[in-house]
Amino acid sequence: MRFCNSKLTSIDNRCDVAIISKDEERFEVKLVESEIARELNRLGALSPRSMQKNILVPFTTQTVKYLLGLEKVSDSTDEMGWFGIEKSLEEIAGFGQHCFPKILEMKNTICDHILSTLSDVNCFLLHKKFREFDCQNHAHKTLEYILYNLARMVVVDKRVDVEFYRLPVEEVKHLLSSEEVNVEQETQIIEVINQWIAADFENRDKFRPMLMSTVRFLALDQQIAKSLSQFHPSLKPARRTRDVLIIIGGWLHRQACDRIEWFDPENNCWKVSQQKLPTTLAYHGSAIVDGILYLFGGSTGQRTRCETWKLSTETWQWDRCNNMMEPRNYISNSSVVYDGRIYVFGGQNFREITRTAVRSRTGEVFDPKTNKWTETASLSDMRSDCAAEVFENQIYVSGGFNGDMILASVEVYNPIGNVFSRTVDLPYPITGHCLLNHGNQLLIVGGFDGAERQNKIWMWHRTGEWQQRPEKLIYGRSTSAACSYKGWLFSVAGYTEKVEATCEILLPEPNASRFSFIPDVPRAKSALNVLVAPNWRNFLERRGTINEQSMEMDDDYEDDAGASYMSINN
């Protein structure tokens, strides 16, 4: 029997009918009340046993339940449930077209649920399934994941979906030829080729010249390039870095700003994005989780904020999330991401009613999956302008200002036990500093000790003490930002004796990228955030940049009005 409307008779949309599944289970529906029922009526066949009542559809009972909303796709989490979901997707894939919008919606819902499980161990399988069922948008997302993570999965972690080793050589070549493949070094492409060939060396070694033609000759050092010349590597330009540094907000020209700037490592320059923040902000927190940028707290210059925003790189629209539990200012360096959740500690809470500013000892955590902030255990000390970082599965919170004095204390938060404990104090009290994990070392960078801004770098040693590194910043700076990027420690902008535009790089790791210097940021600023944005290059390039020369230029001057309390009062 063909499953299409036979048009042998007309069923009034106001009448009750029954949808009959392939398993012969009956579902009473009112066509006038259900768009999906009307779609099933259009594609189903009238039962010859009851021409006025029964509509036979080409779907199993489980699929009909999903379509009629009797069961939720998201409730299927066990092995049998996943089998049923895949079966339902197979059944409705051919009908999930624009002429059946509700069925198409269910097809996308099922694909979304399947995509939520995307990981290193199933990415190739999911990509194959999405292509098989003509789910183009979801196939594109799995391909994006594969291209970004391929070298890491195969070369670094050595843990990848077994379907990778089953790919035909043409697909392997297509993947490795892409501009979007994310590599730290081009030699990783060679190792990916070696691993795929090794899975069936006897039959695949003959494909080596074909695959080696995807290696970018210009991205190899001279010795390696010479050894591979027999394979005729590609003369295309080196692949561009997928991860970029972004600067979020900050104090600019005596006021908070709404700018996003990003660093282009291939051209060694900073660019100003067309994308703006939802409001002007400084001394705020920001984080990227699963590719989404979150923005929270801080100050507009007139008011301490508690709002949380998120930015979709598909629509470039800011959406409001659940507010923080309390307004928090001076949290530029005291928020971190751990296990997919955002933690923030301390800060200053300005009380609108009493018109007083109170330093905070509280902490809170935001879960993007539930869109909620919840309390954490409290710090022992009140502190704003402190710094936090994840190190060895714990969160270190150091230094800061309690409203009366600068602190040297360090507290360690255990996210699993939700408890703080004290550890060894810093060598001296410090605030407005940076704390970061670079090269698997926990480092204190810069800051203000109450008398002068520091250019020293201190390293936490596992013997239980802070040790000074011989390397130093060129400028002592506070209320700056720092991060680990492409094997270097980056120190960006901040406050010296004036607001800075300069950037410094130091402490290169063995395989660090080659930078001779890092140019100044487009405008001097402090109280900013700097983040490594994984796989954001394409997003930012598509969004577009602003030509700085065409922007209104203000006179340069010392911008001490935007410095933190400890920066301008000591």
From Swiss-Prot:
<keyword id="KW-0009">Actin-binding</keyword>
<protein>
    <recommendedName>
        <fullName>Spermatocyte protein spe-26</fullName>
    </recommendedName>
</protein>
<feature type="repeat" description="Kelch 2">
    <location>
        <begin position="293"/>
        <end position="338"/>
    </location>
</feature>
<feature type="repeat" description="Kelch 1">
    <location>
        <begin position="244"/>
        <end position="291"/>
    </location>
</feature>
<dbReference type="InterPro" id="IPR006652">
    <property type="entry name" value="Kelch_1"/>
</dbReference>
<dbReference type="GO" id="GO:0003779">
    <property type="term" value="F:actin binding"/>
</dbReference>
<dbReference type="GO" id="GO:0005856">
    <property type="term" value="C:cytoskeleton"/>
</dbReference>
<dbReference type="Pfam" id="PF07707">
    <property type="entry name" value="BACK"/>
</dbReference>
<dbReference type="InterPro" id="IPR011705">
    <property type="entry name" value="BACK"/>
</dbReference>
<dbReference type="Pfam" id="PF01344">
    <property type="entry name" value="Kelch_1"/>
</dbReference>
<keyword id="KW-0963">Cytoplasm</keyword>
<feature type="repeat" description="Kelch 6">
    <location>
        <begin position="489"/>
        <end position="535"/>
    </location>
</feature>
<keyword id="KW-0206">Cytoskeleton</keyword>
<feature type="repeat" description="Kelch 4">
    <location>
        <begin position="395"/>
        <end position="440"/>
    </location>
</feature>
<dbReference type="Pfam" id="PF24681">
    <property type="entry name" value="Kelch_KLHDC2_KLHL20_DRC7"/>
</dbReference>
<comment type="function">
    <text>May play a role in the spermatocyte cytoskeleton, possibly interacting with actin.</text>
</comment>
<dbReference type="InterPro" id="IPR015915">
    <property type="entry name" value="Kelch-typ_b-propeller"/>
</dbReference>
<dbReference type="GO" id="GO:1990756">
    <property type="term" value="F:ubiquitin-like ligase-substrate adaptor activity"/>
</dbReference>
<keyword id="KW-0880">Kelch repeat</keyword>
<feature type="repeat" description="Kelch 5">
    <location>
        <begin position="442"/>
        <end position="487"/>
    </location>
</feature>
<keyword id="KW-0677">Repeat</keyword>
<dbReference type="GO" id="GO:0043161">
    <property type="term" value="P:proteasome-mediated ubiquitin-dependent protein catabolic process"/>
</dbReference>
<dbReference type="GO" id="GO:0031463">
    <property type="term" value="C:Cul3-RING ubiquitin ligase complex"/>
</dbReference>
<feature type="repeat" description="Kelch 3">
    <location>
        <begin position="341"/>
        <end position="393"/>
    </location>
</feature>
<dbReference type="GO" id="GO:0005737">
    <property type="term" value="C:cytoplasm"/>
</dbReference>
